[in-house]
Curated annotation (Swiss-Prot):
Pfam family, one: Asparaginase_C
Protein name in the entry: Glutamyl-tRNA(Gln) amidotransferase subunit D
UniProt xrefs under InterPro entries: AsnA_fam (IPR006033), Asp/glu_Ase-like_sf (IPR036152), Asparaginase/glutaminase-like (IPR006034), Asparaginase/glutaminase_AS1 (IPR020827), Asparaginase/glutaminase_AS2 (IPR027475), Asparaginase_C (IPR040919), GatD (IPR011878), GatD_N (IPR040918)
Reported function: Allows the formation of correctly charged Gln-tRNA(Gln) through the transamidation of misacylated Glu-tRNA(Gln) in organisms which lack glutaminyl-tRNA synthetase. The reaction takes place in the presence of glutamine and ATP through an activated gamma-phospho-Glu-tRNA(Gln). The GatDE system is specific for glutamate and does not act on aspartate.
Keyword Membrane carried by entry: no
NCBIfam families: asnASE_I (TIGR00519), gatD_arch (TIGR02153), PRK04183.1 (NF003217)
Keyword Ligase applies: yes
Gene: gatD
Organism from which the protein derives: Thermococcus kodakarensis (strain ATCC BAA-918 / JCM 12380 / KOD1)
CDD domains per the UniProt record, alphabetical: GatD
Annotated catalytic residues: T104, T180, D181, K258
Origin: domain of life: Archaea
Subunit structure: Heterodimer of GatD and GatE.
Amino acid sequence: MKRKVDEFMERHGLGVGDLVRVVKREGDERITFEGLVMPPYELSPGETLTIKLDNGYNIGILIDAIEGIEILEKAKEAPKMEFREVLPRKEGLPSVTILGTGGTIASRIDYKTGAVHAAFTAEELAKAVPEIFDIANITPKLLFNIMSEDMKPEYWKKIAHEAAKALNSDEDGVVIAHGTDTMGYTAAALSFMLRNLTKPVVLVGSQRSSDRPSSDAAMNLICATRMAVSDAAEVMVVMHGETSDTYCLAHRGTKVRKMHTSRRDTFRSINDVPIAKVWPDGKIEYLRDDYRKRGEGEVEVDDKFEEKVAILKIYPGVTSELLEFLVDRGYKGIVIEGTGLGHTPNDMIPAIERAVENGVAVCMTSQCLYGRVNLNVYSTGRRLLKAGVIPCEDMLPETAYVKLGWVLGHTDDLKEVRRMMLTNYAGEITPYTRFDTFLR
């Protein structure tokens, strides 16, 4: 059965991409709109005609409210984009590899469902933001095209190897286009897997898809490319520093977290200050002087990783059954998001003792995110320490999860696991708690 919008388009000879003038009846008023006809969403009821206005936004007009429609220009077939093996290069510019993994920075609207889907190749992304060619000679490479919720540890390994390959072949830096939802996990993973890092590795994404007027994709990519040729030889996340298009912040890969579902400045450095502010015009203001500096030497990949690691959140009413299930299923490590300073219910402690006795590494973080785990303050914490829990200082739960998987990839000796978890490898542990970083 045809929907109303399908019949309307057929009756008036409308095609997707046609430029039309629509007269809409609204009470006694008549309102005129001009725009491009968009494909009807497959899953919509089909009661509206969708057109894209010249400001880039889409509007839906009820079919029953349309008093007249005129085709101003029929859609023209879009020219096919030509792809070349070698993109234009300029003498004297540094070289940057862009690794494409998907995500919103490389996405378009799927008009069949109305959802956002990964779409651009790395080359399309580079061509969509020509400003980056004035910053560096760009070598794009598409590794995979997924949304970040589909990211897996095996993909982290591939990204790490491709990044190291580029850096060891005389590239000046690497930019990784990545979805924002799990970008913090990937940034942490690369921070541990890329050893002896001598050049910048920058993860970048966007909160608004590339075809939206409010997209932050272009500015984020420009700023990310600026940081990729900078002096900071760190794994960084570069995203908007505030909601307007002024500057981006470069966050250390082990201390950064997505803190808002939709704001463009969603990423925050937690328990730490960002490495730098970076403006699209190339200005960089370093906010700290202890960042790793660009240097010489070959980047090494240490991608050993134990995937049987889980995060367990503590909440009122939680029982030890969840923890026991993980132990019985052969998990090698458990990161607990404890309450406050790092606590669990007292009746869960026997299950934790059993887990440790069975060789399972149990680590404690705080679901507060800000602040530091301290198991020496209250009796519950002291019991957890006695049970063998490893307090993870001020590490983010996500970072602790990634680090524990990486550590267990190297050893299953719990004494060595404790030593490695409490060793600061990539800035994941700050030496003291800074009070000026709370909710900044």
